[in-house]
Each structure stands twice: as C-alpha cells, then as structure tokens.
Amino acid sequence: MNSASKKAILVLSFGTSYENTRKLTIEAIEHDIADAFPACPTYRAWTSKMIIAKLKKRDGLTIHTVKEALEQMLLDGITDVIVQPTHVINGIENDQMKADALSFRDRFSSIVFGNPLLTTEEDNQAIVRVVADEFRDMDPDTALVLMGHGTEHYANTVYAALD
C-alpha cells in the first residue's frame, strides 16, 4: 500500500430492527473487528432495505446500504476496501452485496471480500465443534433443535451438510 492509500473495512450485515439484538450481535462484531484492526476505519452497511427503512421511520436511525456506505468511503478518501459480511451462508443477500460492491470496482484501488461464517467444510466442522462444546452439559433427555431460516439459493445445502 503506497502512502496515498487508505484502507478501510466495511462490515456488512443483513440487519435487525431489535435494538438489544443489534447491540449483542452486529455491534459486538463491529467492535471486535475495529479492535482487531485499529489502523483501519470501519464502516457499517446492511442489506435489508426493509429494516433500514423501519429503523429510519421508527427511531430516526440512519443505516447505510452497501452503495451508500461505499459512497461515504469515497468521500472519506478510502482507496482500498475490505468487505466482511456477517452473513451465516453465501446466500442471495451475500450475492447481491457483492454485486453492489463490485459496481464500485473502478472507483477504488481494490475491493476484497471476506467470507460468511459457513463457507467451507472446515467452517462447518468448526461450528459443529463449537455448538457441541457449548451444549455438552445439557441434560441427555433434552432435545436441542437448531434452525437456519433457509433459502432457495444453492447455499442452502450447507444446512444438510451440518446435519
């Protein structure tokens, strides 16, 4: 990176209209990323335009879309963008986010993408270990049901791989 370069991280989430959930999940992840990479400014964008509109109307809270966040990054002099989604799988929202971000590829020196949580078989195995460890002391007569909301996207196959 030359001296004129300025790198930043765009943390990308679907979004939530529940304030407590936002603080415990999305904001916690954003803070962890900011703490891990203090030399890189972090920006927020959400993919759910419905939730963005709801928060604007109900709470007066402005959350950027991917394109709005990238426009702001340009105004702030950012030259290199790292996009890190908080998505669980590579679904429809993730594909749309990439398309939106890549529409800016000629306006930044680089745009690179991190992966959603469950991208590789190794990711699947790691999450199974973490969940099993988290619930290892559960009463053996108690059933544990874990659900993903599912999608028509081919990435839905990850749920069968976890079974």
Give the residues covered by each predicted segment:
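Active-site-proximal alpha-helix that buttresses catalytic centers in soluble enzyme cores
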Residues: 1-163
